[in-house]
């Protein structure tokens, strides 16, 4: 499928969309070295060799921004690689396998190699890498198939540079959100307000995702202690997202930026109910501490935040799943994601099996369609 697909689209086809995948990870053929040609001559000279520029080997190991916790069985699905290429590096193969094969009508791309970009100590280097990635993604993926959509990457270390990148990229065809790699500063802090203002101004949601750098680097996002094993880290990812969600709500970010939207990708979902209940209960007795939070915290959560399904919860008793969906208001806040090409990929044909058909449709299509608006068409 090529860009000719876009010309062939009709209103009838757009109305028949069935599945929107909110978390797909494209990877670069030679790791970060792939981005060197997308940088200015000065930046190529300054950091090109450090990114592996000029080498043929994948260079993510020269600058370890992710995968610090190693899955001994492999982090990728073995079948997601075309012969001679690494997983999810070929947009044609990915389109055939994921979009055609799984019946996915829109796939939102979140930068695979840059999940840990927010932990980098040099803001200018991080911003340069983000900008180069955005140009590469548009050229390599978004122009290839009309079904791909992209999250433009920003480096959160320097809000001014991040805003410049948002302004530069916001009108590019296929861009539907801003992918903000997590940083050491919780998301409710004033540090991010210029970014939120730009996101609201352009009508672009902010999306965050686990980084793989948690607690390892000085500027990485924080868990309650540093896990030793991959299985620990993977099971505890919700800690990061609980902390950031509470920060957004308690700092009154959605009062200050009422049109701002935030997506928590791959952060778990069962904790949503408990956190919302606790914040609502405490808000009644502690409102004097946060007078800018004028409504129940859960009201802002339900209106301004969305959460992706993968890795989907698997309770021992299947009937508990329906109860959980009701507790977290899944018919409004939950959006389907596959996490392709990772090892724990959720297949849309069975990931939500057992849920009522109407709820499945809400999660797989209606919720993301309403959330992203016309940009997803």
Spell out what each predicted region is.
Residues 1-377:
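Helix-coil boundary/capping segments in enzymes
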